[in-house]
Amino acid sequence: MATPYVEDESGKYIAATQRPDGTWRKPRKVKDGYTPQEEVPVYENKFVKFFKGKPDLPPGMSPGDEAQARQQQQGIPGIAESETAGLSKTAKRNMKRKEKRKLQGPDSNVEALINAVEMPTSNPAEATNDPSGAAAEKAKKIKNLKKKLRQVEELQQKLDSGEIKQATKEQLDKLGRAKAIQDGLLQLEEDS
């Protein structure tokens, strides 16, 4: 929107205008070389100018050749060109993979999962047949049982000394398992 200038013998003026409420604005003097704010071009740095001036076609290619090249380009089957136009190479590859999965059908993955679930699972220590792994497993169990036995003994001492006046149900259950823990510990120590 260019501002209408009025030229007079004393210089350029922006003419007096009437406001919507009926009052008048004063005419304003405009200096030589003044460019109104709305007419000032937007600043563009060198990078932007370079890419605006850069041709869309590769060097040496005519616009007719470009049309032929676009027609020869193959799109992804089953997907319109407009969908893949702005996608990166990786995104296009992922879309191809999705298409393949759709074509294979959802049942192929389900059958593989069912077969995996139906196979009997075994203890990882037995599957490896690694004596050091089995020994480590036993050592871990022995350590765990010794810790539980130590906790039971500490609880019994606290009850005997009167530190704990009334034992809770969980504490009584723990005391009741003391014999089973000792038997399990003895059995593991005999096996090793």
UniProtKB/Swiss-Prot annotation:
Single GO molecular function: RNA binding
GO biological process: exon-exon junction complex disassembly; nuclear-transcribed mRNA catabolic process, nonsense-mediated decay; positive regulation of translation
Segments of skewed composition (Basic residues): 90-103
Name under which the protein is recorded: Partner of Y14 and mago B
Family matches, as PANTHER family: PARTNER OF Y14 AND MAGO (PTHR22959:SF0), PYM PROTEIN (PTHR22959)
Assigned protein family: Belongs to the pym family.
Span list, region Disordered: 51-138
Coiled coil: 132-171
Disulfide bonds: none
Location within or outside the cell: Cytoplasm; Nucleus, Nucleolus; Nucleus, Nucleoplasm
GO CC list: cytoplasm; exon-exon junction complex; nucleolus; nucleoplasm
Keyword Nucleus: yes
Domain of life: Eukaryota
Function in brief: Key regulator of the exon junction complex (EJC), a multiprotein complex that associates immediately upstream of the exon-exon junction on mRNAs and serves as a positional landmark for the intron exon structure of genes and directs post-transcriptional processes in the cytoplasm such as mRNA export, nonsense-mediated mRNA decay (NMD) or translation. Acts as an EJC disassembly factor, allowing translation-dependent EJC removal and recycling by disrupting mature EJC from spliced mRNAs.
Listed Polar residues bias regions: 120-131
Species for this entry: Salmo salar (Atlantic salmon)
Alphabetical UniProt keywords: Coiled coil, Cytoplasm, Nonsense-mediated mRNA decay, Nucleus, Translation regulation
Assembly, per entry: Interacts (via N-terminus) with magoh and rbm8a; the interaction is direct. Associates (eIF2A-like region) with the 40S ribosomal subunit and the 48S preinitiation complex.
Signal sequence coordinates: none
